[in-house]
């Protein structure tokens, strides 16, 4: 088998859907016994108390009864295709979007609530 360069692998990843990449990550985790989760550094709390984060990760916790409406909201917010959005909803709890400003996250929460879903950050 020919050895693949890092560029070859990256070029292959660019052609994959988000669902295919998710499956690849799970296969790598299983094969090598590792986790793709980033290590979390524990920092000391500021003396004045913890300030609200400026950016959050919006996580879909519960889909509720109207899955189709939730898929539409996911597609609108993320720009994902139908199959990728459906997979994200089917695999709840799942991350919808990372690095979201708090005000935008509140708007997303409202959109998901209108569709019957529950999100948190």
From Swiss-Prot:
Superkingdom: Bacteria
Gene3D superfamilies, per database record: 3.30.1390.10, Single helix bin
Keywords in alphabetical order: Ribonucleoprotein, Ribosomal protein
Keyword hit for Ribonucleoprotein: yes
Molecular function per GO: mRNA binding; structural constituent of ribosome
SUPFAM superfamilies in the cross-refs: ClpS-like, Ribosomal protein L7/12, oligomerisation (N-terminal) domain
GO cellular component: cytosolic large ribosomal subunit
GO BP annotation list: translation
UniProt xrefs under InterPro entries: Ribosomal_bL12, Ribosomal_bL12_C, Ribosomal_bL12_C/ClpS-like, Ribosomal_bL12_oligo, Ribosomal_bL12_oligo_N_sf
Keyword field contains Metal-binding: no
PANTHER family in the cross-refs: 39S RIBOSOMAL PROTEIN L12, LARGE RIBOSOMAL SUBUNIT PROTEIN BL12M
Function text: Forms part of the ribosomal stalk which helps the ribosome interact with GTP-bound translation factors. Is thus essential for accurate translation.
Annotated family: Belongs to the bacterial ribosomal protein bL12 family.
Assembly description: Homodimer. Part of the ribosomal stalk of the 50S ribosomal subunit. Forms a multimeric L10(L12)X complex, where L10 forms an elongated spine to which 2 to 4 L12 dimers bind in a sequential fashion. Binds GTP-bound translation factors.
Protein name per its UniProtKB record: Large ribosomal subunit protein bL12
Protein's organism: Malacoplasma penetrans (strain HF-2)
Lineage of the organism: Bacteria, Bacillati, Mycoplasmatota, Mycoplasmoidales, Mycoplasmoidaceae
């Amino acid at each position: 088998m020919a050895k693949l360069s890092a560029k070859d692998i990256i070029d292959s990843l660019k052609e994959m859907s988000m669902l295919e990449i998710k499956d690849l990550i799970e296969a790598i985790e299983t094969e090598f016994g590792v986790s793709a989760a980033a290590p979390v550094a524990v920092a000391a709390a500021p003396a004045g108390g913890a300030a609200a984060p400026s950016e959050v990760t919006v996580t879909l916790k519960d889909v509720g009864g109207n899955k189709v409406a939730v898929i539409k909201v996911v597609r609108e917010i993320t720009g994902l295709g139908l199959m990728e959005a459906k997979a994200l909803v089917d695999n709840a709890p799942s991350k919808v979007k990372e690095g979201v400003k708090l005000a935008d996250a509140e708007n997303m929460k409202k959109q998901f609530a209108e569709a019957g879903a529950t999100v948190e950050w």
